[in-house]
Amino acid sequence: NSGKPYWWGDTATVMDMRGQDFRFQLDTKKMERLGESSGGYGLGMDPYGRFYETHNLEHVSHLVFPDRYINDRTMLKKHTLSNISDHEENGTSRIYPIGQQDSRVNHPEQSGYFSGSCGILHYGGGAFGKEYDQTIWVADVVLNLIHVDKITSDGASFKASRMHEKKEFMASTDRSFRPVNMSVGPDGFIYVIDMHRKVIEHPEWIPDEIEDSLDLDAGKTEGRIYRINKNGSASGFEVDQFKTNEGLVNALSHPNQWVRMTAHQLLMGSSLSDEVAGLLKQTLASNNSFSRLHAMWILSLQGKLTTDQLLSCLSDKEQGIRENALKVAEQYLNDDKILSKVMAMLSDKDQRVRMQAALGLSTLPGTLASEKEKLMLQFLIQATDQSMDDWNVMSLVLAVKEKRTSFFDKLINDKKNPDPRILSSIVLSINDQQELNTILQSLAGSSLPASSVKQVLKTLSGMKLSSYEGLAIMASLEGIEKNADPAMLSSIAVIRNQLGLPPSLKFITASKKAIAQVLNKELSDSLRLEQMFLVKMLPFKEKEALLFQCLRNTEPLQIQEEAIRQLSEERDPKIGYRIVDMWKELGPQTRRYASDLLLYIEIHHDALLTGLEKGVINIGEMNFDLERRRTLLWWTDNTKTKQRAAKLFSDAGVVNRQQAIEKMKPALTLTGNADQGALVFANVCANCHVYGSKGNSVGPALTEINRKSKEAIMHEILDPNSAVDTRYISHRLETRSGGIHIGIVALENDRQVTIKKMGGTEITVLRSDIKQLSSLGTSLMMEGLEGSLTQQQMADLLHYLQKGAN
């Protein structure tokens, strides 16, 4: 159904669920979108109904609030599903498998990091002690382990912190152990499903030449289920408790979430008798927060919760109950007492409760919202005095509903320095020319700080605006331009362009001057960057020469990066050839951006391949992981491009020194000696690498290299230029006084460059003293180490490195 399910035989109920998680009721045939889906396997829910998700590299995300509140409006954040891990490294979290690792068939750089996270579980079993309450459990099916994070509040959302430092709750040396799902049982213990497969990777992501050597079905009949329990812990639940009404209500206070949810489900299975309703109303006064929570929901869904009872829940001492009571209150907002209480809760002491209060007010029917507009705006303005994160900002703007321009105007008039995030969020939600004109008029006549005006204009310039005919907006823009700095002028020029209005004379004059000012080294770097923003709107021919001059590594980094950004927006094939010609002179950071320009803009593929074929660009500098290789090998319609790329590398990877690797392969089967390996490391590697407490920090630290397979480590030793982190490319720096230094760029900023040489010696040179800085295109690590190592010495070194640093 292409992600658009409907009830059998009733196509009128079709609902677009693409990219969404959802829930449904069989008896009422009701479907409801929950919110954005991570796309991964598993969905965890805590005792208060908050959802946690997982997907491959991103092991734990929190659905901060459901999409139903947004209704397709453009918001400050594009996603309400937020990565909450506080232990990320370059976009994913480090994990600690045990035993000798297999070679990765793709993305070897992901070894030792989450890449197959799944089966997420919020543990609510209550059987493992307080230490494991409020924990998230996530399996990594690739690295054969189960990881545990502790969940704590973080503003209106949460953060996930590692429970065990440099180790996992469960890890296996059996490479066929594939945990894919977990669930809490009636006993409060965790049940783990082990899919058990020797090969877990999807065939699409296994290079064909490697796939031919693998048995993709190995282990498929050996799946199993494990139970994780705590010694001395026993279940305190008797299933007979479910046989009586009193037992069901009492079960709502059980420490095991499974028991509570099952009792809740059974109580909701039929209409409530007076006896059960009476028991639940008594439970609202219980000392147990879980029983109060479930009683409130059951009574409300059965239509038996009174206004006074709900008001009591809205004042509950437990934050999670107040949060849930606000969701219940959405059906009671036509009651003045409830509405007044919800408005007052915009200033609740808890940040997440404040967010939910605003979200609840966003559901207020239009007529009632208009009737209460003045009072609403008063409470919303007061709420801006509270500490806020982006989620609070978004919820406040949603609560404003159609009165956003009134809220914008009142904010800038009543508050000396209103939060620019709120102003920008309001701007994002405007949907017609009249609202745009009102916003611009308010800006033109305001005394807002320049930084706030700048942010609002930047937000507007990034929106899609329809063309406009009339003088009102023109007059407002001219009013703002009177005191505009270069960054503001640039944003206004973009806005004018989108509206179909001509650029102002002030902008035209300033942008012409900017061509000279960008290269004026007497100006501060920040002022020069502002001049770059003015240049952005000029035709490419007028700024072409300037942009390439800005790529020189003697220019400030921000200038280089802005130049490459502007070049990336143009579609002139000669740009690629010019960049390749300049390749050796590009700084390390700029070269990373330039490599993406050459690879991901197809008109530059010929320039890229020519540079690789001629050796101007070292193949290792392009970080050709599987997806980047396939951009040239598979995902282009240009047959010639595919053929040229296939001569440089295969789908399986980049190998420059196959003969040397084949000659040393027997070392992989020899028994290594760690003590002898330590001697080899000291003699061959320690001059540039740190391992444990030994060595010099020039190249990458090898402290965690044991997360890689022996085969992968040997490949990196013998073929150091097949894939080089651009931070470790060798450079030649020549000073104006004639000094020459060769090493890696250890530090590069707008003022100076630090070169680190073999052995760890560092030299720092001011940019003004640099005559030339050029890339040598290769790793500082030399090729040919196989000439100084026997196969046994290689085996010893590999064993030493895989053993783990002390």
Feature roles, as predicted:
Residues 215-221, 228-680, 691, 698, ...:
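Long, ordered, helix-rich scaffold segments
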Residues 212-213, 585-589, 695-719, 731-776:
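Gly/Gly-Pro-rich "capping" loops immediately C-terminal to redox-active cysteine motifs
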Residues 295, 632-655, 663, 739-741, ...:
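C-terminal capping alpha-helices of c-type cytochrome domains
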Residues 1-249, 257, 264-281, 287-343, ...:
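Beta-propeller blade termini and top-face loops
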Residues 605, 714-723, 727-728, 732-733, ...:
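Short glycine-rich, low-complexity segments
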Residues 182, 193, 225, 677-692, ...:
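The canonical Cys-X-X-Cys-His
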Residues 190, 677, 702, 743, ...:
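Conserved RecA-like P-loop NTPase ATPase core
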